[in-house]
């Protein structure tokens, strides 16, 4: 099944569903930005169909529940499609980094596990200096790391700390995989060797990113600015992706 052709066909067939057009437009704009090698400008709206919307659509002639559920499934799985086809896992955008820079001011950042460097690209666009690193272990599985927006140095997350953390004010980790319990060593290294550096982690706590042990050991830093930052981040699917500050 071709994702876009099926989505476009079903969206055209059920065009009377009010929010569908704006959702589809936002999705196409998002992928067009990624294909052009730039960050999307704005957060995505909530993607998917509500139960009342499906019920209303079923009153249309020739409407089929199976098709509506398929349409809803495609909308909900936009993140997965973009991740595996375009190498973007954390759905960051220009508005997020404009708010980030306003709240935290100019800083020097080290991004670890950077993939294609979307976070670094967003920070750089605001005038922040970045050192961008990734272990490049995903390139055989999908396009992550193959088309970086910024130069990316090869280094594991832990190694990058010892190589570059003393040159920056803050460290950012976005969308680290959730299958490796050894990731708990990363915040321990930060706490022991680089306690003065800020640590930002972008992901889903006890969910899609980082190991459960990582989150069990994580020490959050109270920071009211995160409320405004995460409002700017937005929320468009079942993944509750947030920006956290850890010690």
Give residue spans per PLM region:
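Conserved alpha-helix/loop element of class I SAM-dependent methyltransferases that forms part
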Residues: 83-107
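N-terminal accessory regions of S-adenosyl-L-methionine
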Residues: 1-92, 237
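C-terminal substrate-binding/active-site "lid" region of AdoMet-derived donor-dependent transferases
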Residues: 181-247
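Residues at the starts of beta-strands that form the adenosine-phosphate
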Residues: 108, 129, 198
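A short SAM/SAH-binding and catalytic strip from SAM-dependent methyltransferases
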Residues: 168-183
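S-adenosyl-L-methionine
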Residues: 133-170
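Conserved SAM-binding loop of SAM-dependent methyltransferases across substrates and taxa
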Residues: 116-128
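Conserved class I S-adenosyl-L-methionine
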Residues: 105-115
């Amino acid at each position: 099944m071709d994702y876009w052709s099926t989505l476009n066909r079903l969206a055209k067939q059920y065009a009377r569903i009010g929010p569908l057009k704006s959702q589809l437009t936002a999705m196409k704009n998002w992928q067009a930005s990624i294909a052009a090698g730039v960050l999307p400008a704005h957060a995505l709206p909530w993607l998917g169909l509500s139960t009342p919307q499906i019920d209303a659509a079923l009153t249309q002639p020739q409407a089929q529940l199976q098709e509506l559920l398929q349409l809803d499934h495609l909308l909900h799985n936009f993140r997965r499609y973009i991740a595996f086809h375009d190498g973007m896992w954390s759905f960051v955008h220009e508005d997020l980094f404009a708010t980030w820079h306003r709240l935290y001011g100019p800083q020097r950042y080290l991004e670890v596990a950077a993939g294609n460097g979307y976070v670094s690209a967003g920070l750089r666009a605001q005038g922040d200096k970045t050192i961008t690193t990734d272990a490049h272990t995903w390139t055989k599985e999908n396009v992550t790391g193959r088309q970086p927006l910024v130069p990316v140095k090869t280094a594991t997350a832990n190694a990058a700390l010892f190589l570059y953390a003393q040159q920056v004010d803050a460290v950012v980790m976005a969308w680290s995989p959730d299958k490796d319990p050894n990731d708990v060593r990363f915040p321990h290294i930060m706490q022991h060797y680089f306690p003065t550096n800020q640590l930002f982690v972008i992901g889903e706590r006890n969910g899609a990113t980082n190991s459960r042990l990582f989150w069990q050991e994580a020490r959050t830093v109270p920071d009211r600015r995160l409320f405004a930052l995460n409002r700017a981040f937005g929320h468009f699917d079942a993944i509750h992706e947030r920006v956290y500050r850890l010690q």
